[in-house]
């Protein structure tokens, strides 16, 4: 395709708000254009890359007998009410009404729709297992869209759903999909690591995320250097090893702590280590108030809290609720009170004697509070995030951290949706049973960004040849010169028989063409320049920068060999 006919609006400068490298490069190379916050148009080069990614996804889905369908993006509220997610999903769900006042959602996922389809049509165990997938735009009302395609309000996903009669069948499909995802990410040129993860709003009992390693990743991966252990930090278990207490109990003492609002401020004010301070937080669980304690240098993990209590309906109490309950604002709270409020504490609170807690009076704290003497803890548990260097739960050594971008996730949903939506089948005894389900997603547009995050240099993108928008970049330095233009036209005709060729025939300066070529990042560049009269062209690899002068008589064989070795 001639570049003069292709819409590739490259940029010299990118908007200041483009934080992620992939966002800057995709804008600068003319692949995407922002419509509004979190919403982008995919321009010709991006559309070609997306097509290539989707082709690989389809090949791998068909390899494991997944069947492609296409479901509506507009979903009626009644289906979501059946599953219970209409009220539970939260403000990220884009809701709207038609002219008759009927409520709908723009689908972030399709569990409800696909379950309704299958329950109406699938009747017998003889029709199982069944795996359906689609590639479609999804919608999520992100509070703060950022990083370009990595966290947007409209995005492209491949989502698949499997249906089973028994656990063994679900396990087999889960493993097939897990393996297929590994192949997909390898083929598209991403270093993606599977990690144990939380199932979030989708639900289910077992899940892995595939994380593309990146400095701007919004998720932290906890991993071992001695084993294959890897988990999202939300799921990484903290191993508790009791430390014997040696301090004598000291008298409980109330002190004034004016204008102190955080654990760090309190530690500085008292000249104490942060790990000797206790943070007290009040939550509402299904309408009931509880207090949760963690040490000052630890961060509470609400995902673990939800897992411990077996509900997603957990939220921090508001300041007004806390004041009405305990008589003080956050920053002065503690477990020493005579209220009927259950207290839960992270395991490592057990290691402390004579701890510092809020006095439940603004501007005051208590020194030397002790469990069993001054307050009781109803239960201890793992309620916090692991710290780098702490021992891992598999015993393989210290925790190491890396940042990652989630590009895929696989779930075992079990009967979460089939039971709530009455999706059953008849087993071999003729008895109705709820369908077992799996759910599997790949962020196709996220994958586009992740590829760019991992494949670039200071000059631009370096496309893996499996997804590149064009195979070769043919450049004529000066198309006004007959020898260059005629040779370039001849080579274009020859090369496009076996390759997708982007032919830069524009009447631009050589520097502009070379800068754009580096920025766009096609795997191989063929330059027709000053030696055209002698039949000599320059062939250059984008990834290594290696170049060679080649006679046109040998060009096809040279390019074939070069391309096969990339």
Curated annotation (Swiss-Prot):
MF GO annotations: aminoacyl-tRNA deacylase activity; ATP binding; catalytic activity, acting on a protein; proline-tRNA ligase activity; transferase activity
Entry keywords, A to Z: Aminoacyl-tRNA synthetase, ATP-binding, Cytoplasm, Ligase, Nucleotide-binding, Protein biosynthesis
Family: Belongs to the class-II aminoacyl-tRNA synthetase family. ProS type 1 subfamily.
SUPFAM superfamilies (alphabetical): Class II aaRS ABD-related (SSF52954), Class II aaRS and biotin synthetases (SSF55681), YbaK/ProRS associated domain (SSF55826)
Compartmental location: Cytoplasm
Pfam family, one: tRNA-synt_2b
Assembly with partners or alone: Homodimer.
GO biological process, alphabetically ordered: prolyl-tRNA aminoacylation
Catalysed reactions listed for this entry: tRNA(Pro) + L-proline + ATP = L-prolyl-tRNA(Pro) + AMP + diphosphate
Organism lineage: Bacteria, Bacillati, Bacillota, Bacilli, Bacillales
Superkingdom of the source species: Bacteria
Enzyme Commission code(s) on record: 6.1.1.15
Function of the molecule: Catalyzes the attachment of proline to tRNA(Pro) in a two-step reaction: proline is first activated by ATP to form Pro-AMP and then transferred to the acceptor end of tRNA(Pro). As ProRS can inadvertently accommodate and process non-cognate amino acids such as alanine and cysteine, to avoid such errors it has two additional distinct editing activities against alanine. One activity is designated as 'pretransfer' editing and involves the tRNA(Pro)-independent hydrolysis of activated Ala-AMP.
Alphabetized PANTHER family for the sequence: MITOCHONDRIAL RIBOSOME PROTEIN L39/PROLYL-TRNA LIGASE FAMILY MEMBER, PROLINE--TRNA LIGASE
InterPro entries with a match to the protein in the record: aa-tRNA-synt_IIb, aa-tRNA-synth_II, aa-tRNA-synth_II/BPL/LPL, Anticodon-bd, Anticodon-bd_dom_sf, Pro-tRNA-ligase_IIa, Pro-tRNA-synth_IIa_bac-type, Pro-tRNA-Synthase_IIa_type1
Protein name, entry field: Proline--tRNA ligase
């Amino acid at each position: 395709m001639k570049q003069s006919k292709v819409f590739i609006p490259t940029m010299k400068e990118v908007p200041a708000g483009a934080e992620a490298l992939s966002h800057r490069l995709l804008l600068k190379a003319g692949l995407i254009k922002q419509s509004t916050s979190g919403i982008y148009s995919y321009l010709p080069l991006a559309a070609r890359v997306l097509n290539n990614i989707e082709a690989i996804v389809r090949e791998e889905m068909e390899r494991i007998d997944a069947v492609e369908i296409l479901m509506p993006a507009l979903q009626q509220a009644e289906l979501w009410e059946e599953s219970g997610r209409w009220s539970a999903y939260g403000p990220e769900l884009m809701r709207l009404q038609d002219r008759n006042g009927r409520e709908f959602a723009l689908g972030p996922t399709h569990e409800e729709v696909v379950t309704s389809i299958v329950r109406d049509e699938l009747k017998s165990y003889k029709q199982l297992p069944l795996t359906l997938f689609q590639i479609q735009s999804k919608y999520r009302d992100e509070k703060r869209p950022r990083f370009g395609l990595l966290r947007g309000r409209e995005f492209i996903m491949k989502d698949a759903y499997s249906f089973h009669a028994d656990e063994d069948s679900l396990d087999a499909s889960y493993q097939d999909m897990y393996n297929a995802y590994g192949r997909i990410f390898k083929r598209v040129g991403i270093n993606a690591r599977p990690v144990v993860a939380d199932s979030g709003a989708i639900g289910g009992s077992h899940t892995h995320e595939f994380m593309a390693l990146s400095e701007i990743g919004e998720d932290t991966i906890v991993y071992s250097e001695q084993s294959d252990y890897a988990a999202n930090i939300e799921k990484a278990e903290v191993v508790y090893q009791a430390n014997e207490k040696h301090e004598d109990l000291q008298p409980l003492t109330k002190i004034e702590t004016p204008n102190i609002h955080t654990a760090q401020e309190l530690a500085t004010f008292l000249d104490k280590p942060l790990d000797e301070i206790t943070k007290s937080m009040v939550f509402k669980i299904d309408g009931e108030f509880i207090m949760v304690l963690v040490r000052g240098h630890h961060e509470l993990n609400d995902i673990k809290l939800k897992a411990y209590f077996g509900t997603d309906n957990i939220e921090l109490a508001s300041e007004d609720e806390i004041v009405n309950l305990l008589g003080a604002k956050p920053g002065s709270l503690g477990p020493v009170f005579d209220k009927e409020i259950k207290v839960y504490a992270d395991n490592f609170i057990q290691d402390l004697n004579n701890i510092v807690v809020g006095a439940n009076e603004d501007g005051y704290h208590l020194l030397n509070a002790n469990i069993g003497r001054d307050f009781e803890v109803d239960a201890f548990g793992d309620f916090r995030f692991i710290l780098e260097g702490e021992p891992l739960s598999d015993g393989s050594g210290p925790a190491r951290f890396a940042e990652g971008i989630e590009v895929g996730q696989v779930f075992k949903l079990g009967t979460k949706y089939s039971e709530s939506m009455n999706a059953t089948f008849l087993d071999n005894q003729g008895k109705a049973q709820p369908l077992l389900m799996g759910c599997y997603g790949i962020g196709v547009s996220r994958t586009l960004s992740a590829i760019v995050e991992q494949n670039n240099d200071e000059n631009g993108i370096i496309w893996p040849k499996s997804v590149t928008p064009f195979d070769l970049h043919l450049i004529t330095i000066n198309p006004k010169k007959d020898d260059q233009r005629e040779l370039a036209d001849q080579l274009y005709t020859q090369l496009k028989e076996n390759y997708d060729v982007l032919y830069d025939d524009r009447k631009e300066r050589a520097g502009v063409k070379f800068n754009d070529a580096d920025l766009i990042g096609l795997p191989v560049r063929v330059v027709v320049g000053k030696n055209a009269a002698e039949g000599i062209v320059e062939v250059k690899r984008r990834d290594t920068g290696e170049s060679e002068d080649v006679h046109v008589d040998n060009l096809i064989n040279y390019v074939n060999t070069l391309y096969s070795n990339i």
